[in-house]
Regions:
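Proline-enriched interdomain boundary motifs that mark the N-terminal boundary
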Residues: 434-442
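Solvent-exposed loop segments of extracellular immunoglobulin-like
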Residues: 457-464
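A short beta-strand segment in extracellular, disulfide-stabilized domains
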Residues: 448-457
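Short beta-strand segments within Ig-like beta-sandwich modules, predominantly Fibronectin type-III
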Residues: 472-477
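Solvent-exposed segments in extracellular or luminal domains encompassing
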Residues: 479-490
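Hydrophobic alpha-helical bundle architecture
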Residues: 323-331, 335-354, 362
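Feature for exported/extracytoplasmic and membrane-associated proteins, marking the mature portion
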Residues: 1-314, 319-327, 346, 360-433
Length: 500
C-alpha cells in the first residue's frame, strides 16, 4: 500500500484547560484545508508505554556493575551503594540492581525485563532541553527537527493525522500523554498527534460554548477552528470515558493513590487499554532525576532521593505488570524507560553527580527477551570529571526495534520514520510479528482438472504457495491460486504468509 501525499498547513496547539473533572486536556490539530483519508497501514492491537525519567538518571547507581566495584568505590565512594545491599540478578554475579528496585528485580528474574546497557548517541548534548528534544525527535546531535519519531510513525500509519480524525474506523486518539506539557515526541507533520491528559479521576461531563455562530471574519474563522478542535477533543473524551467505565476492578498491587504519581498514571493507562481504547502509544513520566546534590542519605547510601525515585519507578512498573496480567492484556503491552542522559562516573562533593553520557534503560513486558544486552562499563582506576560511561547502543536502534519487532513495520517504513537506517536489537520477541497460519479454502477431493485455493487477504502481505502433485497455473504471491491436478493421486497445498 503506497502512501499518499497530503498538503498541510500547520496550526498551533489549542489548549483546553480544566474542562473534565480533574483532568486537563489538550487537543492538537491542523487547519483542515485539505484532507485525505486512507486505511491505516498496519493492523495491530499492540501498545507501547514509554516512561520518561526527567532529569538524567544515574545509571551506575541503578544497574550496578559489581565487577567494577573496586574502582567505583574510589570514583564515587560518597554515593556508591554498599555491595552487600545490591540486589542480585539471576544468571549473573557481575551486575545487580539498586536495593530499592525489588519489583524490577522480580520481573527481571521472571524474564520480563531487558536491561540495555550504555544507551546514548554520538556527540551527546548535556543540556536538558536539547538532549530531551534529541530523544523525542530521534535526530542527530547537530540537527534540530520539528517532528517527533512517534509523530512520524503516526503519520505513516494514519496519513494526514489529525485532519479527518476521529472517524468511524479510527475513533480513538492514536497516542495519549499522561501529564502536562507539549509532547514533541508526538509532533507529526500535520500537528501534534496526541491528546494530553492529567489528573487522578476519570472523565465526567463536557460542555462547549457553540451556541452563537462564528462571525465571517478572520477572527471568526479562528473561533470556528478552535471549536472544531474542541469538538474533536470532546469526541476523544467520550471515548476515554467509555473505556475507563468499562473497567471497574483492577489489581490491588498499586501503591496508595497519591503516594506514587507514576503508579497513578500507569493505573489509568492499564484501565484505558483494558477498557478497549485503541490508542497505540502512551507516554508517562517521573521527574526529579537531576541529582547534582543530595542524591543519597549521608549515613546510608542505599536510601535518599535517588533511592526514593527508583523505588517509585520499580513499584509502579511491577504493579502495572501485575495489573496487565490481572486484566488479561499482558501480551499486548510492552514498555520502556528513557532519560535524556546519564551521569558522570565520578561523584561530586555535594553528594551527587553531574550530567554524563550513557546509561542503561529498561524494556519490560511479557513479550521481551529478558536478560542484559551489552556489558558493564569499564571503570578506570583513576577517574576524572571528564570521564563518562561510553555509549554501546544508539537509542534510535531501540526505537527501530520497537517499530520492526513490536509494531511490525517493514524496513522501508522504519527508515522513513527514523530518517536513516539503524540496526535493530534482540529486545522484543520478533515472533510477535509473524502472522498466524492462514486457513486454506478449496476442494479437498482428489480429482483431475483445475481447482482454486485461497486464504483471507491482508493488505501488503505476500503469499508463497507450495503444491505437491499439481502445477500452479496462476496466483503465486497472491492470496489465491489456480492449480492443475494431472493425476488422481493425493497431493498437498500449503501457503506461507509474509509481512512486507
Amino acid at each position: 500500500m503506497k502512501r499518499r501525499n497530503f498538503l498541510r498547513t500547520i496550526a498551533p496547539a489549542v489548549v483546553l484547560p480544566s474542562i473534565i473533572n480533574g483532568f486537563s486536556m489538550k487537543a492538537f490539530a491542523e487547519m483542515p484545508l485539505f484532507r485525505g483519508m486512507e486505511a491505516l497501514q498496519t493492523e495491530t492491537d499492540k501498545v507501547l508505554v514509554i516512561i520518561q525519567l526527567n532529569g538524567g538518571n544515574d545509571g551506575i547507581n541503578t544497574v550496578i556493575p559489581l565487577d567494577q566495584y573496586t574502582n567505583l568505590s574510589v570514583a564515587r565512594g560518597n554515593i556508591l551503594i554498599n555491595s552487600s545491599a545490591v540486589l542480585p540478578l539471576t544468571g549473573t554475579t557481575a551486575t545487580g540492581l539498586h536495593p530499592a528496585m525489588t519489583g524490577m528485580r522480580d520481573l527481571y528474574d521472571s524474564g520480563k525485563v531487558k536491561i540495555v546497557q550504555g544507551v546514548s548517541y554520538p556527540n551527546p548534548n548535556f543540556s536538558h532541553f536539547a538532549a530531551t528534544d534529541i530523544w523525542a525527535t530521534a535526530s542527530d546531535s547537530d540537527q534540530s527537527l520539528n517532528t517527533g519519531w512517534l509523530g512520524r510513525y503516526i503519520d505513516h500509519e494514519f496519513p494526514g493525522f489529525p485532519a479527518g480524525y476521529p472517524n468511524a474506523s479510527t475513533p480513538d486518539p492514536i497516542a495519549v500523554q499522561m501529564g502536562v506539557g507539549v509532547p514533541l515526541m508526538f509532533q507529526a507533520p500535520g500537528g501534534l498527534a496526541a491528546i494530553s491528559v492529567s489528573g487522578t479521576s476519570i472523565f465526567n461531563g463536557w460542555t462547549i460554548d457553540g451556541a452563537n455562530p462564528a462571525p465571517g471574519s478572520y477572527a471568526g474563522q479562528e473561533l470556528a477552528f478552535a471549536r472544531s478542535i474542541a469538538q474533536q477533543t470532546q469526541s476523544y473524551a467520550a471515548r476515554l470515558t467509555a473505556a475507563a467505565n468499562n473497567v471497574t476492578t483492577q489489581s490491588p498491587s498499586y501503591p496508595t493513590a497519591g503516594t506514587n504519581t507514576l503508579a497513578d498514571q500507569l493505573k489509568i493507562v492499564a484501565q484505558l487499554i483494558a477498557g478497549g481504547l485503541q490508542s497505540r502509544v502512551y507516554l508517562v513520566s517521573l521527574g526529579g532525576f537531576d541529582t547534582h546534590s543530595g542524591q543519597v542519605d549521608t549515613t546510608d547510601t542505599s536510601i535518599g532521593t535517588h533511592a526514593d525515585l527508583l523505588g517509585k519507578l520499580s513499584a509502579a512498573i511491577k504493579a502495572f505488570m501485575d495489573d496487565l496480567t490481572f486484566l488479561n492484556i499482558a501480551n499486548r503491552v510492552t514498555g520502556m524507560t528513557f532519560s535524556e542522559f546519564g551521569r558522570r562516573i565520578i561523584s561530586n562533593a555535594s553528594g551527587g553527580c553531574d550530567h554524563g553520557v550513557a546509561a542503561p534503560l529498561f524494556v519490560f513486558g511479557h513479550q521481551v527477551q529478558g536478560g542484559i544486552l551489552g556489558s558493564n562499563p569499564t571503570i578506570p582506576s583513576v577517574v576524572t570529571s571528564n570521564d563518562n560511561v561510553p555509549m554501546q547502543y544508539d537509542f534510535r536502534s531501540i526505537y527501530a526495534t520497537m517499530l520492526k519487532d513490536w509494531f511490525c513495520l517493514d524496513q522501508t517504513a522504519i527508515d522513513d520514520i527514523m530518517l536513516q537506517p539503524f540496526s535493530t536489537l534482540p529486545v522484543v520477541n520478533s515472533a510477535c510479528c509473524v502472522p498466524p497460519t492462514p486457513v486454506i479454502t478449496g476442494s479437498s477431493a482428489v480429482c483431475i482438472g483445475t481447482q482454486n485455493y485461497s486464504v483471507p487477504a491482508t493488505a501488503g502481505h505476500t503469499y508463497v504457495w507450495d503444491v505437491v502433485g499439481g502445477t500452479i497455473l496462476s496466483g503465486q504471491g497472491t492470496n489465491q491460486i489456480q492449480v492443475q491436478w494431472s493425476s488422481g493421486t493425493a497431493g498437498t497445498v500449503s501457503v506461507t504468509e509474509s509481512t512486507p
